[in-house]
Amino acid sequence: MGLLTGDLLGILALAMVIFLLLVDLMHRRSRWAPRYPPGPMPLPGLGNLLQVNFQDPRLSFIQLRRRFGDVFSLQQIWRPVVVLNGLAAVREALVSHSHETSDRPPVFILEHLGYGPRSEGVILARYGKAWREQRRFSVSTLRNFGLGKKSLEEWVTQEASCLCAAFADQAGRPFSPNNLLNKAVSNVIASLTFARRFEYNDPRMLKLLDLVLEGLKEEVGLMRQVLEAMPVLRHIPGLCAKLFPRQKAFLVMIDELITEHKMTRDLAQPPRDLTDAFLDEMKEAKGNPESSFNDENLRLVVAHLFSAGMITTSTTLAWALLLMILHPDVQRRVQQEIDEVIGHVRQPEIKDQALMPFTLAVLHEVQRFGDIVPLGVAHMTSCDIEVQGFLIPKGTTLITNLTSVLKDETVWKKPFRFYPEHFLDAQGRFTKQEAFMPFSAGRRSCLGEPLARMELFLFFTTLLQAFSFSVPTGQPCPSDHGVFAFLLFPSPYQLCAVPR
């Protein structure tokens, strides 16, 4: 009987192996299609998981691009992936085929966070009616902000003053600016979403920031890729909660803030912020099962604004200050322009940037060199498309290697150096560059770009109006190489802020 049982188990195991190989074979069929992008041979049942460094995929993509060209394919277990490199390929996919590449891959593994057909937020939402509804709402709310007592620019200007006060408290001693930058930018998002600000030592502020930063680390690594490619694994009890505890805790905090905000709402008054405006839309959509305005989606829209809106802008500012202490000649030229255009009596205003071409060029070069979101957010094809002569089938995940655009050697004079002149013409006037894509491109480009540009200019100029920054005496010059954790953070550093 034991022998029979052993034989039966052997047969079942063999049948399972054959079944998995057949499934794997079916998912490889796209590789045999004419003009499908080349790529490394995937392993049965694993695809190319062991051939890509998921702690920092950029390193693997550099090698694969040299071997296979600007458009190459990967197999994420059974999910087909195409990586796009260089300005020509990325522009063709995201701009020329904007409609066909505006979808997102499904995020089944985030169901434990409340994602579903009617609650996808904005950033990760599938391309369709709900996304268009939320994108339109978010853009119009950002544009029309000012329904409350303060305009968005006034909020940023006020927060920049608070940030300067916090820098002054360091009394010229060496310190890392990262935490203070995170707090300042978070308060701008808090003003937009909850019409309030937090004191920099507020325990809730500190916890919120910690959860955002630690939650980012849950976005990278091999296990995350396995779960995305085999979403059936999400049904293993407790697995997702164990792998993404900080993302869950972050959403719990957002729920608490929304609940408190609802209790203070005066319906006789106009909306104070985005949350109030969303609640008004929910009231109008009541009874419409197709509407994306619901409690579940409110928490995700607010969460996306907080996480994406805070960390990208504060990280860019951290890069800006690092590059200023590494390039004091550039810092002096920015300060000279500030002195000539703004002076020392009043604070910078957004209208000043039209008269400050060098400062504007420096901020653009910070974003290009810093390369904050190197791989963008994944897209997915909604139909067969052709890019650079290759046929990419419907349902293929697209990774846009924005690093390869921002550091494209065929476009930039000095792609791997910090060189503000990339954005200046021969007469010293600011000039735009087509390959400047830190916010991506096409229909899914970052909706918060106008807010980010305002924050970067006002925070940066206010800080350089008030302080001169330098490497602390006795410390070596910090590295200008980044640390990858979904975003690209500057290597840890300290600086001294001396009042001017």
UniProtKB/Swiss-Prot annotation:
GO molecular function: cholestanetetraol 26-dehydrogenase activity; heme binding; iron ion binding; oxidoreductase activity, acting on paired donors, with incorporation or reduction of molecular oxygen, reduced flavin or flavoprotein as one donor, and incorporation of one atom of oxygen; vitamin D3 25-hydroxylase activity
EC number: 1.14.14.24
PROSITE patterns for this protein: CYTOCHROME_P450
Family annotation (Pfam families): p450
Membrane association type: Peripheral membrane protein
Binding residue positions for heme: C446
Origin superkingdom: Eukaryota
Catalytic reaction(s) noted: calciol + reduced [NADPH--hemoprotein reductase] + O2 = calcidiol + oxidized [NADPH--hemoprotein reductase] + H2O + H(+); alfacalcidol + reduced [NADPH--hemoprotein reductase] + O2 = calcitriol + oxidized [NADPH--hemoprotein reductase] + H2O + H(+); dodecanoate + reduced [NADPH--hemoprotein reductase] + O2 = 12-hydroxydodecanoate + oxidized [NADPH--hemoprotein reductase] + H2O + H(+); dodecanoate + reduced [NADPH--hemoprotein reductase] + O2 = 11-hydroxydodecanoate + oxidized [NADPH--hemoprotein reductase] + H2O + H(+)
Cofactor (UniProt): heme
Family according to the record: Belongs to the cytochrome P450 family.
Protein name, entry field: Vitamin D(3) 25-hydroxylase
Species of provenance: Sus scrofa (Pig)
Organismal lineage: Eukaryota, Metazoa, Chordata, Craniata, Vertebrata
